[in-house]
């Protein structure tokens, strides 16, 4: 338990990824390149969807918001991580730590819910194609987006309240490259029981509800696709879901490994690698996953390139 005269620290010290001096600059260059690619690809996809009329559909509205959350939560984490490679004293203010954690939970919860909404969108498109234009109107899409951001805000508020209940009397050294809840639990001088319960219940509610919606949607999608006689029809139906399934597997697999465990099972060194994957690598991979075999995105990119550079591409104008 915390002592009665315990005061809140004004700063935390982030241990970073490694304390090996010889690795600081190489890692800085690697993650700077990854962050640059992340911003260019996600912001590029946002821009492409905004300007191309062919992509003004519910599926791409959701994808545009997914790119926004990827770019945003990578920006919440990566710049500070890059700074730790260059700074001798790797500090972050107490307020900065709280804000970083709040923003991180807000954006990752938004992504979690977006993946569920995107699964529902694919379910309606494949299982109820005739009703799709009436069900998934632009107004409905934006109401869904607004609702999921609001729910993500509430989840972030609960998590942050759990963090604010903690005291740090004996140590302010966070064994991580950003202010995540598990290393802060490790250095708390007060009981973490209530805070841990809040985080696990709130996090489980959103993660599991997202997974359940995704699973139910894909059960109905598979049952519908099996009934399609045409091989081309089956391929087209499944091809629209492949990218989403890859993104879901990467995101939810890592989140479940990271957070839906009791604190006593945490291994901070292992968690650093897992955290690195979903805070830095996944935001870079998502736009590539969704664009890799997507003919509509490729055609839109050709049209934008043709318009920007003033040349005519026969494929672009089709």
Curated annotation (Swiss-Prot):
<feature type="transmembrane region" description="Helical; Name=1">
    <location>
        <begin position="27"/>
        <end position="49"/>
    </location>
</feature>
<dbReference type="GO" id="GO:0005886">
    <property type="term" value="C:plasma membrane"/>
</dbReference>
<feature type="transmembrane region" description="Helical; Name=3">
    <location>
        <begin position="101"/>
        <end position="120"/>
    </location>
</feature>
<comment type="similarity">
    <text>Belongs to the G-protein coupled receptor 1 family.</text>
</comment>
<protein>
    <recommendedName>
        <fullName>Olfactory receptor-like protein COR3</fullName>
    </recommendedName>
</protein>
<keyword id="KW-0325">Glycoprotein</keyword>
<dbReference type="GO" id="GO:0005549">
    <property type="term" value="F:odorant binding"/>
</dbReference>
<keyword id="KW-0812">Transmembrane</keyword>
<keyword id="KW-1003">Cell membrane</keyword>
<keyword id="KW-0675">Receptor</keyword>
<feature type="topological domain" description="Extracellular">
    <location>
        <begin position="165"/>
        <end position="205"/>
    </location>
</feature>
<feature type="topological domain" description="Cytoplasmic">
    <location>
        <begin position="227"/>
        <end position="239"/>
    </location>
</feature>
<keyword id="KW-0297">G-protein coupled receptor</keyword>
<feature type="transmembrane region" description="Helical; Name=2">
    <location>
        <begin position="58"/>
        <end position="79"/>
    </location>
</feature>
<comment type="function">
    <text>Odorant receptor.</text>
</comment>
<keyword id="KW-0807">Transducer</keyword>
<feature type="transmembrane region" description="Helical; Name=7">
    <location>
        <begin position="272"/>
        <end position="292"/>
    </location>
</feature>
<feature type="transmembrane region" description="Helical; Name=5">
    <location>
        <begin position="206"/>
        <end position="226"/>
    </location>
</feature>
<feature type="transmembrane region" description="Helical; Name=4">
    <location>
        <begin position="140"/>
        <end position="164"/>
    </location>
</feature>
<dbReference type="InterPro" id="IPR000725">
    <property type="entry name" value="Olfact_rcpt"/>
</dbReference>
<dbReference type="GO" id="GO:0004930">
    <property type="term" value="F:G protein-coupled receptor activity"/>
</dbReference>
<feature type="transmembrane region" description="Helical; Name=6">
    <location>
        <begin position="240"/>
        <end position="260"/>
    </location>
</feature>
<keyword id="KW-1015">Disulfide bond</keyword>
<feature type="topological domain" description="Extracellular">
    <location>
        <begin position="1"/>
        <end position="26"/>
    </location>
</feature>
<dbReference type="InterPro" id="IPR000276">
    <property type="entry name" value="GPCR_Rhodpsn"/>
</dbReference>
<feature type="topological domain" description="Cytoplasmic">
    <location>
        <begin position="121"/>
        <end position="139"/>
    </location>
</feature>
<dbReference type="GO" id="GO:0004984">
    <property type="term" value="F:olfactory receptor activity"/>
</dbReference>
<feature type="topological domain" description="Extracellular">
    <location>
        <begin position="261"/>
        <end position="271"/>
    </location>
</feature>
<dbReference type="InterPro" id="IPR017452">
    <property type="entry name" value="GPCR_Rhodpsn_7TM"/>
</dbReference>
<feature type="topological domain" description="Cytoplasmic">
    <location>
        <begin position="50"/>
        <end position="57"/>
    </location>
</feature>
<dbReference type="Pfam" id="PF13853">
    <property type="entry name" value="7tm_4"/>
</dbReference>
<feature type="glycosylation site" description="N-linked (GlcNAc...) asparagine">
    <location>
        <position position="5"/>
    </location>
</feature>
<keyword id="KW-1133">Transmembrane helix</keyword>
<feature type="disulfide bond">
    <location>
        <begin position="97"/>
        <end position="179"/>
    </location>
</feature>
<keyword id="KW-0472">Membrane</keyword>
<feature type="topological domain" description="Extracellular">
    <location>
        <begin position="80"/>
        <end position="100"/>
    </location>
</feature>
<keyword id="KW-0552">Olfaction</keyword>
<keyword id="KW-0716">Sensory transduction</keyword>
<feature type="topological domain" description="Cytoplasmic">
    <location>
        <begin position="293"/>
        <end position="318"/>
    </location>
</feature>
